[in-house]
């Protein structure tokens, strides 16, 4: 555990092999030409080279590139956002079709400045992808939309293949890590989503290494399961800049393997756990696992 003002040395298992082949450069060019944003770039995701260069997948970030919140773990720009871009859904859908994606992940900055929290644009993006790529599965990753469940219903009525909303950290650390969100609101958001569309898998993720205990991580598992969450992801918190929260601990891959085993024993349909795991990491595999489990239970 890190002491005050002490920076931990990044361990060997977190060193990433950079791959910038033609898939990577082509995808980056496509994003710029269509004036699109990805959370891969904006949040400095450590898996960007694997996903773009090897798997040729990306997580689109809609509603602009400026977030109305300032969570202390997140590298996305914060401030006063620009007006909503009503053409954004079509551009995202065109890119999904051009890339011939099997699975598309759509996330967004928080838009607390908008009455609908951006739900209308979010929903139209899903519908546009359905029209142009009917065989592409779609995962949506919204903010808590300020706890407005009419806005959540707008999104759930489009019937995405997975609803993903991240609880991010343990209950005790939530006020320090994401001051404008609450632990219980995130749980209720996930529960309401499942109530609205019981057959659609729900998913949530946490970052560890912020000073939580193993018991608190297991408490998160229990809380998510109590609110009918199907899929969980657990990854290592990495400090994006010196202005963000410091890493308190780097977990060994064996510790992640143990947490995954506990999560699966507790009843999640799928758990992705590892030092470089992020919310949408191997998302295409997760939707397949959830679908198989639903079919087996039918």
From Swiss-Prot:
The keyword Iron-sulfur applies. Keywords: 4Fe-4S, Cytoplasm, Iron, Iron-sulfur, Metal-binding, S-adenosyl-L-methionine, Transferase. Binds 2 [4Fe-4S] clusters per subunit. One cluster is coordinated with 3 cysteines and an exchangeable S-adenosyl-L-methionine. GO terms for cellular component: cytoplasm. Pfam families: LIAS_N, Radical_SAM. Signal peptide: none annotated. [4Fe-4S] cluster 1 binds at residues 40, 45, 51, 280. Disulfide bonds: none annotated. It comes from the Bacteria. InterPro entries: Aldolase_TIM (IPR013785), Elp3/MiaA/NifB-like_rSAM (IPR006638), LIAS_N (IPR031691), Lipoyl_synth (IPR003698), rSAM (IPR007197). Its EC number is 2.8.1.8. Its cofactor is [4Fe-4S] cluster. GO terms for molecular function: 4 iron, 4 sulfur cluster binding; lipoate synthase activity; metal ion binding. One of its GO terms (biological process) is protein lipoylation. Transmembrane segments: none annotated. Pathway: Protein modification; protein lipoylation via endogenous pathway; protein N(6)-(lipoyl)lysine from octanoyl-[acyl-carrier-protein]. Its main location: cytoplasm. It is found in: Cytoplasm. [4Fe-4S] cluster 2 binds at residues 67, 71, 74. Residues 53-269 form the Radical SAM core domain. It catalyses: [[Fe-S] cluster scaffold protein carrying a second [4Fe-4S](2+) cluster] + N(6)-octanoyl-L-lysyl-[protein] + 2 oxidized [2Fe-2S]-[ferredoxin] + 2 S-adenosyl-L-methionine + 4 H(+) = [[Fe-S] cluster scaffold protein] + N(6)-[(R)-dihydrolipoyl]-L-lysyl-[protein] + 4 Fe(3+) + 2 hydrogen sulfide + 2 5'-deoxyadenosine + 2 L-methionine + 2 reduced [2Fe-2S]-[ferredoxin]. Belongs to the radical SAM superfamily. Lipoyl synthase family. This is Lipoyl synthase. It comes from Bacillus subtilis (strain 168). The lineage of its organism: Bacteria, Bacillati, Bacillota, Bacilli, Bacillales.
């Amino acid at each position: 555990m890190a002491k005050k003002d002490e920076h931990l040395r990044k361990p060997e298992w977190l060193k990433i092999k950079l791959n910038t082949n033609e898939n990577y450069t082509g995808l980056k060019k496509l994003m710029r030409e269509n004036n699109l944003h990805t959370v891969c770039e904006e949040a400095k995701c450590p898996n960007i080279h694997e996903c773009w260069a090897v798997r040729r997948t990306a997580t689109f970030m809609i509603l602009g590139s400026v977030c109305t919140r300032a969570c202390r773990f997140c590298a996305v720009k914060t401030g006063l956002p620009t007006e909503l871009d009503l053409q954004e859904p079509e551009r995202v859908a065109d890119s999904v079709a051009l890339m011939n994606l099997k699975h598309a992940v759509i996330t967004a900055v928080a838009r607390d400045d908008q009455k609908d929290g951006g739900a209308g644009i979010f929903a139209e993006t899903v519908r546009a992808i359905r029209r142009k790529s009917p065989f592409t599965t779609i995962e949506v990753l919204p903010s808590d939309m300020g706890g407005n469940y009419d806005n959540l219903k707008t999104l759930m009525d489009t019937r995405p293949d997975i609803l993903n909303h991240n609880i991010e950290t343990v209950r005790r650390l939530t006020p320090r890590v994401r001051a404008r969100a609450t632990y219980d609101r995130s749980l209720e958001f996930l529960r309401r989503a499942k109530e609205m569309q019981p057959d659609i898998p729900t998913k949530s993720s946490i970052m560890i290494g912020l000073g939580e205990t193993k018991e608190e991580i297991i408490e998160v598992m229990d809380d998510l399961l109590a609110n009918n969450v199907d899929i969980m992801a657990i990854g290592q918190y990495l400090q994006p800049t010196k202005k963000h929260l410091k890493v308190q601990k780097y977990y060994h891959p064996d510790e992640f393997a143990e947490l995954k085993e506990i999560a699966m024993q507790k009843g999640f349909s799928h758990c992705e756990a590892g030092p470089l795991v992020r919310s949408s990491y191997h998302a295409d595999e997760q939707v397949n696992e959830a679908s198989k489990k639903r079919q087996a239970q039918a």
